[in-house]
């Protein structure tokens, strides 16, 4: 009896941690849309600018795919759960929006899948799903979490757009190019990502990137948390 109770509690904990359905993971129908769109951003954001612009900032875990909205460029909706909050009052479970869907996605920006951990800078949005939030600056401010073997957590700026803005404004020198990191560390990050998202893990190799005009950068969690703490103090 005790073993059965323990098994039940463990299963319940896993469902809570992943925000994925207890009836089975619901993933998007495709990761890459039928058409490839080219993004034209009105502006880019440094980490500090995105933090100040956002209603809420948090490390979140993507859960089940909920659906899509067509009309113009598609939007996809997911369940998501807060792992750690840095700004604002984001509900523990909420709806995360992503630009892209089955009809089309941006180049080198696949749809999320259950288990992705993201550091996101969010604004409240109007949608048919409850507690919906979308990223400030679309994909340009989405940072993917990955852990090295020694426990160091890194955040991957896959397109380097936030990092480029850091260099323009001189806000900080928080980031470093992925290409300059030790090869062993990059392999460790790729292996960690492969646990939940093999497609994302492949993108860590610059030779496998379809869009070679962008260079990935990485931040350490410690560096970003120090920045966020200073911004919260005002």
Enumerate the language-model features and the residues they cover.
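N-terminal, intrinsically disordered, polar/charged segments of Gram-positive cell-envelope systems
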Residues: 22-53, 177
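Short aromatic-glycine-enriched beta-strand elements
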Residues: 68-81
């Amino acid at each position: 009896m005790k073993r059965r109770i323990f098994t039940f509690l463990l299963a319940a904990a896993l469902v809570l941690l992943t925000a994925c359905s207890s009836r089975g993971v619901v993933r998007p129908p495709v990761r890459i849309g039928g058409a490839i769109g080219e993004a034209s951003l009105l502006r880019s954001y440094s980490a500090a600018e995105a933090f100040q612009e956002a209603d809420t900032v948090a490390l979140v875990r993507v859960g089940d795919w909920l659906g899509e909205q067509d009309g113009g460029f598609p939007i996809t909706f997911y369940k998501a759960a807060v792992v750690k909050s840095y700004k604002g009052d984001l509900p523990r479970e909420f709806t995360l929006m992503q630009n892209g869907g089955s009809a089309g996605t941006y180049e080198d920006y696949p749809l999320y899948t259950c288990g992705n951990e993201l550091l996101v800078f969010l604004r409240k949005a109007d949608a048919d799903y409850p507690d919906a939030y979308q990223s400030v600056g679309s994909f340009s401010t989405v940072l993917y979490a990955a852990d090295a073997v020694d426990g160091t957590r890194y955040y991957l700026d896959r397109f380097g757009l936030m990092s480029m803005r850091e260099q323009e404004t001189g806000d900080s020198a928080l980031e470093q190019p992925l290409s300059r990191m030790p090869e062993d560390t990059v392999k460790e990050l790729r292996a960690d990502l492969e646990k939940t998202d093999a497609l994302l893990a492949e993108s860590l190799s610059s030779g496998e990137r379809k869009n070679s005009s962008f260079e990935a950068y990485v931040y350490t969690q410690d560096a970003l948390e120090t920045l966020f703490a200073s911004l919260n103090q005002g």
